[in-house]
Each structure stands twice: as structure tokens, then as C-alpha cells.
Amino acid sequence: MKTEYIIGILKNVSIFNQLDDENLELLSKKFVFQKIPKDTVIFKENDLGNQMFVIISGVVEVFKEYRKKRKTLALLKRNDFFGEISVFTSLPRTASVQTLSNSEIIVLDQSDLINIIKNNYKFSLNLIKVLSKKLINANAEIQSLTFKNVQNRATTQIL
């Protein structure tokens, strides 16, 4: 895949869009392109992982399974990224990811991402900002689910 094409993609990805052209070019050469068929599990919760992914085309579902029930956490599309938690924490994957359509992604290894963090202050600050927004959204979802559970329990007690 051409470097210019990957640079064009990265300029639209929230964690990479603050990089200058020189760093984008260096980073773009580290990505590996993959075509993934519909219904392919990219990774499962609790898998070990040292790569993050950027979607070029297609849709993927991020989900968790509990007692044979599946809960969709997010639907991701072009210019979205995933897999970063394991890259930064070296912990197992926190959710599973599966393609919902034929998809094209680019993959970046942990060591390459860590190098750009070490060498680019502006990138590091932007990364903190983007990940903080993800945390805020996750906290809002938790709060919403907690409130719904309280309402459901209260309704059940009244009936």
C-alpha cells in the first residue's frame, strides 16, 4: 500500500492527526495492511496483544460476552482505531472485535507506537486528550447503565 495513501488515512485518525508530515511519513511505513473478511474475529477478550488497528474501510464490532450473552460496546468504521488499551498496558485484550463487513485495516506494532510517543511531545499530548475523551464517554455509559439498573430495581420492588 502506498505511503501517501496511508498518510491520508492517518491525517483523519484522531490520535495521529497532530503529527507533522515528516512523522506521518515515518509512521506510515510501519503500518501493515490487511484485508479481513466479514465475520472474522480479529481478537478475543483476554487474548494477549501488542498491536493497534486503524480501520480503512468496513465496520467492526467491539463486544463483550457474559453468560453467553453478547453486549456491543461500540461499532467502529473508517478512521476509527482500536486495540490501543493492550498496547499501552501490556494487559490482555479487554473486549473482542469482529468484522461486520469485509474490512481493510492497517496494523501498528507496540514498539513503533511507543517510539513515536517517546519522540513527539505534541503527539503524546494529543494521545492523552483522545484517550481521555474515550474515558469520559465510557464513564457516561457506566453512569447511564447504573441509573437504568436503579430504575429497574425500583420498578421491580414497587410491583
Give residue ranges: language-model regions.
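Polybasic "coupling" helices that flank or enter modular domains
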Residues: 118-159
